[in-house]
Amino acid sequence: MNRQSWLLNLSLLKTHPAFRAVFLARFISIVSLGLLGVAVPVQIQMMTHSTWQVGLSVTLTGSAMFVGLMVGGVLADRYERKKVILLARGTCGIGFIGLCLNALLPEPSLLAIYLLGLWDGFFASLGVTALLAATPALVGRENLMQAGAITMLTVRLGSVISPMLGGVLLATGGVAWNYGLAAAGTFITLLPLLSLPALPPPPQPREHPLKSLLAAFRFLLSSPLIGGIALLGGLLTMASAVRVLYPALAINWHMSAAQIGLLYAAIPLGAAVGALTSGQLAHSVRPGLLMLVSTVGSFLAIGVFGLMPVWLLGVICLALFGWLSAISSLLQYTLLQTQTPEAMLGRINGLWTAQNVTGDAIGAALLGGLGAMMTPVASASVSGFGLVIVGLLLMLLLGELRRFRQPPPVPDGAPL
């Protein structure tokens, strides 16, 4: 492939065996978690007939993930990262086995589902931060943009396949099959991960875990560059919460059940296109400015989305949001990994991922509140245009990020 192509270069999977192992493990893991994501709400709904109970399980799991990201960040900067990844994956699989055994009981325990949800949410996120912190060592910092784009494609592809597979399993075998295959898939991921090289953390003084986490917070707040990236990431995740308005907007547009699915598919499709056409992003001399512009553009797409007279134009706006948000996210990921000191990669990655989780929850709550006071169309537009104003202000305030320059990559003669 031509080095100047806009298309994503997949050669990293050929030239870096360790990254190929991570790619395979991540894809299997995403499919496994997707099976779980379909089964848990369906089982709780069947047991309780309460959407509140379903929502409670999501909240508990999300809370455990937040804590896991914080703890995982500290562990990834303190202990051998490969061991943290393997421990987290294996422990997570044990929780899936517990869900499977519980589902096979004549009267499954609702409390067990909640407790195992806490268990799996914590340990799943524990491994995420260690894997993120280890990525620069696996591919080299010069290949982080390419690695991030390939990872994004993996996530999108797995997110499309797993719900469909999970639905088929539910219809044919029940939730126990979903849990059992999720457990099997999780343990299978250990095989490629065992081939990873040792990933020791950089040497640093021993300190209390809370003090270590506080040091990362201070670094995040004191660094205009890293702090600005994290802030943009949170706002972008808030904007993606517009999906809570899809059912109401579908009624306004008189959409059929099949057409509603296009709304949910539009953003992932746009993001996949963004990842596929990211071949030149690594050559950007001013990635900070490009990140700011793409983020504001994505907010504008959400603002215009709700104003569209027909649903097809709305789908196009969502796809545009997905494309622009993918560009911004890839730049965020790359700058965060390259500009963060090696000794803090675990904690900063944990904080960055945690604020994404928090941003989604805050965005959903705000849109839900707006929906109670105004029409769905107005809610989507107000949120989008409000974020545009915030984004424009940040373009003025985040001067260091806006002016940040990096030299273009030097060709290394690697096969393309």
Curated annotation (Swiss-Prot):
Q: Which UniProt keywords apply?
A: Cell inner membrane, Cell membrane, Membrane, Transmembrane, Transmembrane helix, Transport
Q: How does it sit in the membrane?
A: Multi-pass membrane protein
Q: Which residue ranges are assigned to the Cytoplasmic compartment in the record's topology? A: 1-21, 77-83, 131-156, 200-218, 278-287, 337-356, 400-416
Q: What is one term from the GO cellular component aspect held by the record?
A: plasma membrane
Q: What does this protein do?
A: Component of an export pathway for enterobactin.
Similarity comment: Belongs to the major facilitator superfamily. EntS (TC 2.A.1.38) family.
Instruction: Report the protein name in the record.
Output: Enterobactin exporter EntS
Provenance organism? Citrobacter koseri (strain ATCC BAA-895 / CDC 4225-83 / SGSC4696)
Q: Which gene encodes it?
A: entS
